[in-house]
Amino acid sequence: MDRRIFGLENEYGVTCTFRGQRRLSPDEVARYLFRRVVSWGRSSNVFLRNGARLYLDVGSHPEYATPECDNVTELVTHDKAGERILEGLLVDAERRLHEEGIAGDVYLFKNNTDSAGNSYGCHENYLVARHGEFSRLADILIPFLVTRQLICGAGKVLQTPRGAVYCVSQRAEHIWEGVSSATTRSRPIINTRDEPHADAERYRRLHVIVGDSNMSETTMLLKVGATDLVLRMIEAGTVMRDLTLENPIRAIREVSHDLTGQRKVRLASGREASAIEVQREYYEKAVDFVERRGIRTGTVDQVLELWGRTLDAVEAQDLDRIDTEIDWVMKYKLIERYRAKHNMTMSNPRVAQIDLAYHDIHRRRGLFYLLERKGQTARICNDLKIFEGKSVPPQTTRARLRGDFIRRAQEQRRDFTVDWVHLKLNDQAQRTVLCKDPFRSVDERVEKLIAGM
């Protein structure tokens, strides 16, 4: 599939401090956060003018699902627009708290674990053709996804009985199955619940829930871009070596605990391979595939260049080569500088604070944004595009139809209901349009519905 629909869903961690002490429960903080949303949307589950969905997920986690995008750079822009929207809710919530005499600071973290050991996710969605054999897709994809953390993990200070250690991935400790239809109970690598949000006879939606939430634009580009290339190879029937892992769940933890990428994991065939070797197998196949198919674009070149350079840098342990582009490396360097300056161990509580503060989405407070202000983060988006993404949907996918419909209905003060595939006016006629094709950004039926308001 040369043109694919992508979507990202990020759940955010939420907390509130009162002079450094927790004062409100996450439930109460979430209510303050969403008060403005509920006042206009009459619900804490709404679709926005940019085509995205914003809602309160299980356990008081705000979740932002990007609109459908058909290129990876646009997807990253819309994910960042989601951060900005939530930052706006945060500022608004703090103002309301202060007006009510509660001197609290509200924090939203774009990470995947909290101090109590709970995990919440970053879910990637890829539209794939229905005709392929899903089990083959999963078999080829799982070794890639288990080792992919090496190129796109967000990094984590993990507390263990033997003290704190730095790991590559936040989610690795919380994954318990390879393929499953549940997302919360068993936490698989790939979720098989079949909700394509499109024509079910033609498409299915691959739902990957093993990845970390990324702060870095370039890490996000690499995560989704490399996965897209692997999917294209599978769809084209490219012959791949059998890299099936003996135990993917053990392997994902072993890979996360080894910053060198050299530790061997056991394959089902009895062979052993390191995470670097597994990734190189996919990377070299992808380079060859792109050349043979003639599918080079600026984005594909960027993804392949960063993928190869990241593997080289990790293998040589020359992390300076990627310390503005890959989240786990950026955070690791930040922590190591701090530890050296203050002569402290990884187990020091202040190190755990830095780990968390890296993911604070408040741009004046978060450590990732401190690095960005200092020019120490590579970028692929610009701030104007991100600002536009808060209210303007992608113009080449179904999100445009949804966004235009919502904008018009709100301007005309009309009551309406939307989801990923339906647009409905709640008037006497109960007019509804079903939009099954996520690639379609122009539809006469929707134009008619909008014109009739």
Curated annotation (Swiss-Prot):
Which amino acid positions bind Mg(2+), per UniProt? 9, 55, 63
Q: Which residues form a coiled coil?
A: none
Q: Which Pfam families match?
A: Pup_ligase
From the UniProt record, give one GO term of the biological process aspect: modification-dependent protein catabolic process
Which GO molecular function annotations are given, in alphabetical order? Answer: ATP binding; ligase activity, forming carbon-nitrogen bonds; magnesium ion binding; ubiquitin-like protein transferase activity
Active site (catalytic residues): 57 (proton acceptor)
The reaction(s) annotated as catalysed by this protein in its Swiss-Prot or TrEMBL entry are:
ATP + [prokaryotic ubiquitin-like protein]-L-glutamate + [protein]-L-lysine = ADP + phosphate + N(6)-([prokaryotic ubiquitin-like protein]-gamma-L-glutamyl)-[protein]-L-lysine
Q: PANTHER family, from UniProt?
A: PUP DEAMIDASE/DEPUPYLASE, PUP--PROTEIN LIGASE
Q: What does this protein do?
A: Catalyzes the covalent attachment of the prokaryotic ubiquitin-like protein modifier Pup to the proteasomal substrate proteins, thereby targeting them for proteasomal degradation. This tagging system is termed pupylation. The ligation reaction involves the side-chain carboxylate of the C-terminal glutamate of Pup and the side-chain amino group of a substrate lysine.
Read off the HAMAP family from this record: Pup_ligase
Query: Any extra detail in the entry?
Result: The reaction mechanism probably proceeds via the activation of Pup by phosphorylation of its C-terminal glutamate, which is then subject to nucleophilic attack by the substrate lysine, resulting in an isopeptide bond and the release of phosphate as a good leaving group.
Q: What family is this? A: Belongs to the Pup ligase/Pup deamidase family. Pup-conjugating enzyme subfamily.
Q: What is this protein called?
A: Pup--protein ligase
